[in-house]
Regions:
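A generic alpha-helix structural signal
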Residues: 1, 35, 39, 300, ...
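N-terminal amphipathic alpha-helical interaction or autoinhibitory segments
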Residues: 1-15
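Exposed alpha-helical structural elements
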Residues: 5-9, 33, 37, 279, ...
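Extended, compositionally biased eukaryotic interaction scaffolds
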Residues: 7-11, 26, 34, 75-76
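Short helix/strand-capping connector loops at secondary-structure junctions
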Residues: 15-23, 317-324
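Positively biased amphipathic helices and basic secretion/translocation or surface-docking motifs
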Residues: 17-54
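A residue-level detector for the "anchor" residue at the start of short, highly conserved motifs
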Residues: 46-57, 68-359
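N-terminal low-complexity or simple alpha-helical regulatory segments
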Residues: 62-64
């Protein structure tokens, strides 16, 4: 026989009053009203100085149904880390324009906002320094081999800089990169030496333009391409337009067509060619850093160069977690870290300029 308490509970559930009460609650959870409530709570949680639009990172972490609703509402991504305001409070700011120029005589010039407006006397010409660009095209003319003077520009961690060479070629240098180049090119030859990453817009002059790296040599006449040649990483030459010849220096060479990429593992001497979306590999010049199904360790290696940070992992397995996203190059890193946290696969804390990942 059922107990008296069970019978009372059954009678309560079956009562008109209980049914009406819960029917009202059910009606309260219609989708329109529900999402308005969510939006209200989200806006209350929005503590950040700048809004981060959902579409910046939505492909990485947010479920499809939330993508649709948030996109239609055109609302900002909430500060998703309830109870953990440390990531937002401890700002890690993006890099900026800065470099060090070493002249042929050994003199060094710091290129940053403090050097804006300064002039250099080179080859009898006044070279104007801007906070983001150094333009050598004013030092016109060509000289013989005996008179060549080489300068070297080095971009530190957390920096970027644009250089216009004597022939009008524009070079965008990424963080932790350097370029050695002549003040003026010798007759019939244009050659520079690159370490790190740079995006080249080569001016057509009728003479070959050669970029030498530790593992590859790229020869062009007039074209646009990106070279990534960081020590310890795969070397990549990505052709946007024109034509380039890639040579390993070990008897293997090939000619790239637009939208092709040549990659080389240092020391292997073996070049691999594939067709790629060039915008993915050159977007850093336009303010975005793209990642597609990449290991967390590789993602953070790239970001550490730009944000001037160190990265630690409490568990080696975390390095192999894969993500796809893009990061706005000129924003703080906190929104990206918060969205990593939102996956619930990984946790993040900041200790000064070190980012620590743990389970």
């Amino acid at each position: 026989k059922e107990s008296k308490s069970h019978e009372q509970l059954f009678q309560k559930i079956c009562s008109d009053e209980y049914y009406a009460q819960h029917e009202i609650r059910k009606m309260e959870f219609d989708s329109q009203a529900g999402w308005k409530g969510v939006e209200t709570r989200i806006k209350r949680m929005e503590l950040r100085r700048r809004h981060l639009k959902l579409l910046r990172y939505v492909a990485l972490f947010i479920a499809p149904v939330l993508i649709l609703v948030f996109a239609l509402q055109d609302i900002s991504v909430p500060h998703v880390m309830d109870g953990n305001q440390l990531l937002a409070a401890q700002q890690i700011l993006p890099g900026g324009a800065k470099a060090i120029l070493t002249l042929d005589n050994g003199e060094t010039v710091y290129l940053d906002e403090n050097a804006d407006g300064r002039q250099l006397q080179l080859a009898g010409k006044q070279i104007q320094i801007d906070s983001t660009t150094l333009n050598y095209s004013a030092a016109d003319g060509q000289v013989g081999q005996s008179a060549l003077e080489y300068n070297k520009i080095e971009v530190p961690q957390g920096g970027e800089y644009t250089l216009v060479l004597n022939d009008g070629t524009k070079v965008h240098l990424n963080s932790m990169s350097s370029l050695r180049f002549p003040l003026t090119f010798e007759a019939g030859k244009r050659e520079v030496e690159l370490a790190g990453e740079a995006y080249f817009e080569v001016n057509k002059t009728g003479h070959p333009f050669i970029v030498s790296t530790q593992g590859m040599q790229i020869e062009v006449l007039g074209t646009t391409f990106n070279i990534s040649a960081y020590p310890g990483e795969e070397y990549q030459a990505t052709l946007v337009s024109g034509s380039v010849k890639v040579d390993t220096g070990e008897g293997q060479s090939l000619v790239l067509k637009p939208s092709q990429q040549a990659s080389l593992i240092p020391g292997s001497g073996n070049i691999q060619v594939r067709t790629v979306d060039t915008a993915f590999y050159t977007s850093w010049v336009k303010g975005k850093i793209n990642f597609k199904d990449q290991r967390l360790e590789d993602i953070m290696r790239t970001l550490s160069r730009w944000y001037n940070i160190e990265v630690d992992y409490s568990d080696e397995a975390l390095k192999n977690l894969r993500f796809g996203c893009y990061v706005n190059r000129y924003e703080e890193i906190a929104p990206f870290l918060e969205l990593l946290e939102a996956t619930e696969n990984i946790h993040v804390k900041i200790n000064g300029k070190t980012i620590i990942f743990y389970k």
